[in-house]
Amino acid sequence: MSLANVVVIGAQWGDEGKGKITDLLSRSADVVVRYQGGVNAGHTIVVDGRVLKLHLIPSGILYPDTICLIGPGTVVDPKVMLGELDMLLANDIDISGLRLASSAHVTMPYHRLLDLAMEKQRGDRRIGTTGRGIGPTYADKSQRSGIRVIDLLDEQRLRNRLEGPLTEKNELLEKIYGIEPLDGEAVIQEYLGYGQRLSKHVVDCTRAIHSAAKARKNILFEGAQGTLLDLDHGTYPYVTSSNPVSGGACIGAGVGPTLIDRVIGVAKAYTTRVGEGPFPTELSGSLNDQLTERGGEFGTTTGRRRRCGWFDGVIGRYAVQVNGLDCLAITKLDVLDEMDEIQVCVAYELDGERIEYFPSSSDDFARCKPIFETMKGWQCSTEECRKLEDLPKAAMDYLRFLADLMEVPIAIVSLGASRDQTIVVEDPIHGPKRALLSA
């Protein structure tokens, strides 16, 4: 499978299975770039029976000839990152291809403490943060008081940069939240140590990407979370603090939009959400339990049980529009194997009126009632299917319905966690932009 410059995004609320799809596409990539988010995201990859859980490091690290860049739009927790590197080394995985943007911002210990304290203070108004300090890190970045990776490489610079923010954060911790202040010298020494270990990976990300582009290398941009968690385009305020949408790749990696050739969206065959916020197709009772257990719907980062519901075609169409999707990868089709009936949300009812768009107000979204189309289930295993024609007719009908509903081709179908449990319907990079699986 040849590759151009491609963005892979989540078309729902995250946890769509982007890690597996990125892993599949990374085989042909020269460079993989993570462009936003931090350790609040997580992806699981199964390789030769080994389960590898990564939060910050791109899936492409599993390919020794691939350069993996953590871009300036990310926020880096160096302690977690080094833990991931140690895990990869313990699994005999070469990490020499890892590159870390010198301008990426760093999650400091006070960010994590403030994240948890602020969420606790919100009470019933909590937003469902992972508690990893992501929001406070991005807030400091916007307020121009953040610490960057490059600051960890020079002791005097780190001391100068940290003096004001640490004093301010300690006052907040102690006087507002009643938390013991941090020892500034201990923080400095700890983070200088992280900088020393990471220094060999630190680069000017923009120069590295444009050098690769000039050399006509294939570049894969990997987003974290999903479209409905985007700070500007998601279910605000129940969102993340960055831009997972495809446009975020330009800002978070430092490239112009003309460098991007294709955008691939990843969506589950049903829908999940972690944390708070409206979720029109959410299920309860035995159906919810069935999806949770069969789909292993527990967060990679937090371990929290994910909320499960039927496929929502309204937010799917919205994701197609916001990201300019060229094609879709549908994951976890096998999780629906035992269902006798499957429902798909095709529209909402809002205050007695049928609407077919995603409302920008979360209050309006919370009042939306799903309007479903009911489809026949296939009630047999799809896990061993390797070609489209191997799928039962009802499964084919379901995929065709999703493609028509979202008005975008389905190029990849995933039927399990392993690499080989995948049907590549057509080349997701160079395939025609047509209605796939049409009659």
Curated annotation (Swiss-Prot):
Chief subcellular site? cytoplasm
Enzyme Commission number(s) of this protein: 6.3.4.4
Q: What is the lineage of its organism?
A: Bacteria, Bacillati, Cyanobacteriota, Cyanophyceae, Synechococcales
Q: What are the names of the required cofactors?
A: Mg(2+)
| SUPFAM superfamilies for this protein | P-loop containing nucleoside triphosphate hydrolases
Positions of IMP binding: D15, E16, G17, K18, N40, A41, G42, H43, T130, R144, Q225, T240, R304
Entry's family note: Belongs to the adenylosuccinate synthetase family.
Q: What is the annotated localization of this protein?
A: Cytoplasm
| Identification of the protein by name | Adenylosuccinate synthetase
Single GO cellular component term? cytoplasm
Does the keyword field hold Ligase? yes
Q: Report the NCBIfam families cross-referenced here.
A: PRK01117.1 (NF002223), purA (TIGR00184)
Cofactor remark from the record: Binds 1 Mg(2+) ion per subunit.
According to the record's subunit comment, the protein's assembly and interactions are:
Homodimer.
Q: Where does Mg(2+) bind?
A: D15, G42
Residues binding substrate, per UniProt? T300, T301, T302, G303, R304, R305, R306
Q: Which GO terms describe its biological process?
A: 'de novo' AMP biosynthetic process; IMP metabolic process
Keyword Zinc in the entry? The reply is: no
The residues annotated as the active site are D15 (proton acceptor), H43 (proton donor)
Q: Where does GTP bind?
A: 14-20, 42-44, 306, 332-334, 414-416
- Catalyzed reactions: IMP + L-aspartate + GTP = N(6)-(1,2-dicarboxyethyl)-AMP + GDP + phosphate + 2 H(+)
